[in-house]
Amino acid sequence: MNLGERILDHYELFLGKYIGVDKYTSGEYVIQLLGFDRTFKDCLTFASLGMSNYSNLINNSCEIIMPVDDDYDNCAVVFANALFYVLQQQMDFGRGTIIEGLDNIIADFSKRHNKTAIYFTESYVLPEEFSKIEDHLKMYMAFFISEKELEFIHNYGCEEFENLLENEKA
């Protein structure tokens, strides 16, 4: 079984059966986003497949999930483009990574959703066993954040932000 098949098996074990998949390409980079509709109540969860192929560029062997509750098509495009940005910039990817400028991807996205950035962290809302595949591939979670949340992170750091989320059971 190859790595892609192991990742898919892992997703289906924890997220359920996927209901669809879309392929995204940007230059030399190719990723897929799988959709899972039963992971979180009233949300569609996107899960990347292919980020781990570029682990040498971002110093991290990983895949990322992102639950969204509205505007699924546009959210998928924004999420995929944020992942491409991580790859193109060869960012040192991990917990606390933030991608700003969502309106550069889809005009007025921030205004329509009151969200201005994507925040990446550990997949704390799922069982701990979800967080790794075979001790070398890490699973992250992403979510949209508001301007106010972004400002909080810039002022106090990701540790304080995540403490706040934990205290509020977000």
Feature locations, PLM:
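Acidic, proline/glycine-rich low-complexity IDRs
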Residues: 1-61, 65-170
